[in-house]
């Protein structure tokens, strides 16, 4: 169906945030998803970077604005402001790096402190292509942590393009479903408020209180 001129060329705009330790592959995941490219010579993100991609989510055209945050401690104050506007958060660790997995709890504390209470989140264990020789975090441990927090869980490889799109689409679906539910609830509330505000009118045939039967005999 043709879009009306002057209106957005998408059905929904969703802001996603990639967080996790430096070096876990957040920028590589973003580049693979948005541009279907991979490079092993990424320079560590300085501050904030973002890309945009439009995707089909359950028949709706969704514009994803995906923000890639720096993982180093000295940039935490910069990235904290971006939590507040995020509708979905992808929390990434490196399956070959125990410290990055342990730090997931620290990132969760940041999310709980700065992000909206209803923000959708998923957990991603990246660098699956190195699993055979260098894995130190098992699938079971990753899944157990995701279950503890109530997250979806994916293991991905930006290099081999494994489960990358599925992870981004999954969080986008969760956000879209929540947004639609909130919109429906808001419409219902407005209808209820409108109904409550309508005055009650008596028809001409309705007896007034004075015309009722007297309790006196």
Swiss-Prot record:
Entry-linked PROSITE patterns: RAB
In the UniProt record, which is one GO cellular component term?
plasma membrane
Q: What does this protein do?
A: Protein transport. Probably involved in vesicular traffic.
According to the UniProt entry, where does the motif Effector region sit in this chain?
A: 42-50
Q: So which domain of life are we looking at?
A: Eukaryota
Q: Which InterPro entries match?
A: P-loop_NTPase (IPR027417), Sigma_54_int_dom_ATP-bd_1 (IPR025662), Small_GTP-bd (IPR005225), Small_GTPase (IPR001806), Small_GTPase_Rab (IPR050305)
Q: Where is this region: Disordered?
A: 198-217
Alphabetized, the UniProt keywords read:
Cell membrane, GTP-binding, Lipoprotein, Membrane, Nucleotide-binding, Prenylation, Protein transport, Transport
Which GO biological process entries does UniProt record here? protein transport
PANTHER family, per the entry: LD44762P
Spell out the family assignment given in the record's similarity comment: Belongs to the small GTPase superfamily. Rab family.
* Membrane topology qualifier: Lipid-anchor
Lipid linkage positions (S-geranylgeranyl cysteine): 215-216
Which Gene Ontology terms cover its molecular function? GTP binding; GTPase activity
Give the gene name: YPTV2
Q: Which residues bind GTP?
A: 20-27, 68-72, 126-129
Q: What is this protein called?
A: GTP-binding protein yptV2
Do you know which NCBIfam families this protein is assigned to? small_GTP (TIGR00231)
- Where is the protein found, in the record's own terms? Cell membrane
Stretches with biased composition (Polar residues): 201-211
